[in-house]
């Protein structure tokens, strides 16, 4: 197996990344440079070590300073030490990290997209200045606490409470499946006040009554990123830690609309990795006296996989253009997330089939991408929830209740 694995790895490394419709030609020099440096990081720093961390369900802390050195945290945010890159460049960052590993991409996406994104969208200028520069340098890690044990898809019904007091708020409740929670320096907690209004509160590491230590490890996807259940028992939050412009659940929705686009890009990264692995494997694996790439059944699978990858790439590029023009709607983001997650899961499964039994081994990476895609399909709104958002948009009728 080692000889075959070495040949497949060499073939993947030597081949150009999948770009069948020559989308690379549409990138600016800046976008291409960002893509190239993140790809180099993913190939040289993430890919060689990630299987071991994934298998042990441990987070690769050694990568944090290397991610910081890339200078991409905060992606599209202007100022505050953030790069202010284009929406397309931000998508390429997510795609390239995910091509190597979904866990590392989730760590980055939660920190940069959900935590920093919420502060940027919902915070005052003073709050942005207070937190974003250190987060851009990854000196402080962020997390985003919305999902609860009893409320996943129905997150609008959240039960975590924020009770007013003279100098701030007291938070009580539980959050679950919170990425980065156990290692974060600050967690944005969405909670409901006495008037029923939903707001966002920045809880800092070490706050009395704040316990993010219940790490969820017995999972089969995204094993190298730590997700946890958070307990909040009479956690005191100063008034200045309530984000100034987070006043309703719609503000959480604004954040998720943006990050769903990121999940669509992530799906492309997983699909590209699996297609490229299957193509290389088919060229190296011989059965019945010739490479299996020469058989009609395998070529049919590869052609279908390439079609799915290319369609997902095109959808992401157009979505980024619409977002740059401030014309992207929540339903557009949902459609991209739904479609790309569906097709990426299909590509990963087809790649596993092309690799046969070897597709189940971590060594070939496909199995890791396949199980990680189950997580992508679930978080930031399941396939079914995205379909209801799109359905409501095209029919004018809500099927949520």
What is each of the regions a protein language model found here?
Residues 2-23, 93, 114, 126, ...:
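Glycine-rich phosphate/cofactor-binding loops in nucleotide/flavin-utilizing enzymes
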Residues 23-27, 212-310, 376, 385, ...:
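Glycine-rich beta->alpha junctions and the first turn(s) of the following alpha-helix
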Residues 47-55, 279, 283-290, 306-339, ...:
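C-terminal helix-coil-helix/basic helical segment that borders enzyme active sites and/or dimer interfaces
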Residues 69-139, 179-186, 323-326, 368-371:
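Internal helix-loop-helix
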Residues 138-146:
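A short, Trp-centered hydrophobic/proline-enriched beta-strand micro-motif
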Residues 153-154, 169:
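Hydrophobic, small-residue-rich alpha-helical packing segments that form membrane-like cores
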Residues 160-163:
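A structural signal for short hydrophobic beta-strand segments in well-ordered beta-sheet cores
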Residues 172-213:
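A short core secondary-structure module
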